[in-house]
Design a protein with these regions (language model features):
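N-terminal soluble domains immediately following signal/targeting peptides that reside
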Residues: 1-151
Length: 151
């Protein structure tokens, strides 16, 4: 998960094996798999529920770009090896004060049961940071995890 705070925008780039998102790494075959893909795409498109940007930045969700060759989404990376099915996503938030953002509450673990950990890099006016988020245990697993940076 790469986060860039740049001008009036908070941009989030995500790359994940499809298995983490829908439970398999290929094009859907059964009706149940097709439904799982539809549900996952709907959740990802509602990115302002998955990523709650620090209210101090006053952000609104902008464009969401989802790409996956196996799922027939967007324009997937032609350099991606055949048979390696992943999902690439770009989420843009338009903000009135993006530089005030010091955290994002990430709800990916609650939305996608296959995720165990998220490696993140943040680039902001406060500097560059690396963070690792791990799935909370037990009842906390559905709670958001705060990705914070800066002072």
């Amino acid at each position: 998960l790469d986060v860039a705070v740049d001008g009036p925008t908070v941009g989030i780039d995500m790359e994940s094996p499809l298995d983490n998102i829908v439970g398999f790494e290929r094009a859907p075959k059964t009706d149940a798999e097709k439904k799982a893909v539809e549900d996952a795409v709907a959740v990802l498109r509602a990115a302002d529920k998955l990523f709650v940007v620090d209210p101090a930045a006053n952000c609104k969700l902008g464009p969401v770009d989802l790409r996956s060759g196996a799922l027939g989404l967007g324009n997937p990376d032609p350099a991606e090896p055949v048979g390696h099915a992943d999902l690439d996503a770009t989420f843009s938030f338009n903000c009135t004060n993006a530089s005030a953002a010091k955290f994002i509450d990430v709800n990916l673990f609650g939305a996608f049961k296959g995720l165990r950990q998220i490696d993140s890099q943040i680039a902001s006016a406060q500097g560059q940071f690396k963070r690792q988020l791990k799935r909370p245990a037990g009842a906390q697993a559905s709670q958001p995890v705060r990705l914070s940076w800066g002072k």
